[in-house]
């Protein structure tokens, strides 16, 4: 096996320092998709959204849809999630990803997928809204969502009780808590993310994964 030259190793390290992986996370109804679209455009990065991939798969695979709509949603959701990581690897770690990564079990999975994409320190944007507001927003849009999503108007959804107790950021890198109860200053958020990436590149030995920055729009 050939040896990697010092110059090539340096270039690889500089590339890793410059790449920006942004995870836009939060409860359903927290405003993730809206913020992620605007943020990706501001940063000049591709956007990979779980629901967009899931709905596309559902449209193409509709003839295979089983009777159990919840199982169908789960299967396509898992496929969509795997697709996000494949796209991130192809993008060499430079992208905005948007999905609801909620619950401790997902933290280990996301960390492993980031490792496989060569991402050491992601920037996480947590869409910070009260649970009651997120739930109201979500329930208002249920009748208008793509039919692959299994929720139906008026049906109880016990997941909200669990989310109210446990939902929070993954904390796999710096967390930018963004108040999404109203309009967000996207250029200012993008500037904060760029500054955080520069700081991580300047101090590659800093492994603190607990830093949080509250970002409130004016």
Regions found by a protein language model. Name each.
Residues 75-119:
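Glycine-rich phosphate-binding loop used to anchor ATP phosphates in small-molecule kinases
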Residues 24:
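Hydrophobic anchor at the beta1->P-loop junction of P-loop NTPases
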Residues 27:
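P-loop (Walker A) phosphate-binding loop of NTP-binding proteins
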Residues 143-189, 208-211, 215:
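Small-molecule kinase domains that catalyze NTP-dependent phosphoryl transfer to phosphate-bearing small molecules
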Residues 30:
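ATP-binding Walker
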Residues 37-89:
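Conserved substrate/cofactor phosphate-moiety recognition/catalytic segment
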Residues 117-139:
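Conserved phosphate-donor/acceptor-positioning beta-strand/loop module used by diverse small-molecule
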Residues 33:
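Walker A/P-loop
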């Amino acid at each position: 096996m050939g040896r990697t030259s010092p110059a090539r190793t340096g270039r690889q390290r500089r590339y890793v320092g410059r790449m920006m992986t942004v995870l836009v996370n939060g409860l359903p109804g927290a405003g993730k998709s809206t913020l992620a679209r605007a943020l990706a455009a501001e940063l000049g990065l591709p956007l990979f959204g779980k629901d967009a991939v899931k709905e596309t798969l559902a449209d193409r695979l509709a003839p295979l849809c089983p009777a159990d709509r919840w199982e169908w949603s789960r299967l396509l959701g898992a496929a969509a999630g795997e697709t996000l990581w494949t796209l991130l690897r192809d993008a060499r770690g430079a992208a905005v990803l948007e999905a609801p990564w909620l619950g401790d079990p997902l933290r280990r999975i996301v960390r492993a997928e980031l490792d496989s994409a060569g991402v050491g320190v992601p920037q996480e944007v947590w869409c910070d809204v009260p649970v009651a507001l997120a739930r109201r927003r979500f329930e208002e849009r249920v009748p208008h969502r793509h039919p692959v999503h299994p929720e139906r108007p008026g049906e109880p959804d016990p997941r909200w009780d669990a989310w109210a107790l446990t939902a929070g950021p993954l904390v796999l890198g710096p967390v930018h808590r963004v108040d999404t109860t109203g309009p967000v200053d996207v250029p200012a958020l993008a500037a904060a993310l760029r500054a955080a990436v520069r700081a991580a590149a300047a101090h590659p030995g800093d492994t603190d994964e607990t830093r949080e920055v509250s970002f409130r729009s004016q």
